Amino acid sequence: MGPEAAGPGRGAAPRLQVRTWIEPVVAATQVASSLYEAGLLLVVKASFGAGAGAGAGAASNHSAGPPRGAPEDQQQRAISNFYIVYNLVVGLTPLLSAYALGWLSDRRHRKVAICVALLGFLLSRVGLLLKVLLDWPVEVLYGAAALNGLCGGFSAFWAGVMALGSLGSSEGRRSVRLVLIDLILGLAGFCGSMASGHLFKQVAGHSGQGLVLTACSVSCATFALLYSLLVLKVPEAAAGSGQALSAGDSVAGTVGTYRTLDPDHSDKQSVQGLHPPSPGKAKPRRTIIALLFLGAIVYDLAVVGTVDVMPLFVLREPLSWNQVQVGYGMAAGYTIFITSFLGVLVFSRCFQDTTMIMIGMVSFGSGALLLAFVKETYMFYIARAVMLFALIPITTIRSAMSKLIKGSSYGKVFVILQLSLTLTGVVTSTVYNKIYQVTMEKFIGTCFALSSFLSFLAIIPIGIVAYKQASWLQYGDVRET
């Protein structure tokens, strides 16, 4: 990375620049989150009387015996109903605070949204720890989730992370920087998920099962909060957009990927003497941002629905996973962060940004369709492998939008995007859980088939963006219609 933080002397600059890195906060937070997510699922499963499920799941990766009937179905419905309410609380409570935190971050201090959201993360992890330690009812977790949401939740945290990542990088390098943050998030989530099942089994045979797992989650969340408060520094804004573009041209392949979404860029690249830029003509920024929003929301519907149903799917026949297998399955999901990062580095050398977005959508849609027909554990991992580029669309859309807005509006716009995704995700979670309850005895893969359809449907607005992009490159600029 280039020297984006200025200091009084050359010796002090590298040290100051290291303190502007958001990656340690992202890594610690994601380890805490992956431990928490696995712990939440396993604790809730145990709370709803998982006596029938754990032993059979430990014996094999799939059930070879007769169906376990009503008790398993009742447990699945109880877990599903818990997550319906839980996801509603997690999704709706940030609406009261996340936008305000984004506004404060833009006008007061960039760390406000991150620090307040991390405080909420810590409180929710402490809530799960107390539930395990004191054997409280599962309804306590709704209150812990509400505290997390009132502090901004993931919407405020991730918007703050994206704002700091965008602010501290030049426009040319921003695409790779944001995907690198996602890579760190994926690696941390992979490590946490791999360890989660083993940590959960450290205290077994009584209500304290999961104590070690939840304590580790609280420790990581505490570290992230203290680091963001005491160590993290806000990076100084990178050079002006024009200079950043010039500097970025020296980075082979990866730089020009997202830049063509900016209508002004087509003016800069137009052949001299052919359609010179006209300052009086309006540029269709709002249209493109709206299309990107639409594509992101429809695609996120597919992703959220799949992610919400998958934990229930792997606990039930035909897979019937145990605690360790659940952790491994979650870890497999985090490898998508790694493969998507590598995909951006490779595809950006030969494809436009819209093409990369569509590749990611096809990857996820195909994997979700395969997931609908999974009968064995190895088939599950094959389906997950097909989803290897599933992260590219949302990350690329965020990067593209950052090129179309002013730096002073990063926090606000990213919060609006994240809240839109969160709000639609809440509705999706409720609908998908209800669909799963109705169809799990007839065709358990119904939700995955629906996600596949939505993923391919999301390609349409991105295709329109690609068409408009081709018009810019051909004619130099266009009028807003």
UniProtKB/Swiss-Prot annotation:
Organ and tissue specificity: Highly expressed by the epididymal duct epithelium.
Main location: membrane
GO MF term set: cyclic-GMP-AMP transmembrane transporter activity; transmembrane transporter activity
InterPro entries from the UniProt entry: MFS (IPR011701), MFS_trans_sf (IPR036259), Tet-R_TetA/multi-R_MdtG-like (IPR001958)
Post-translational modification: Glycosylated.
Glycosylation sites per record: 61
Record flagged with keyword Glycoprotein: yes
Membrane topology term: Multi-pass membrane protein
Protein name (database record): Solute carrier family 46 member 2
Lineage of origin: Eukaryota, Metazoa, Chordata, Craniata, Vertebrata
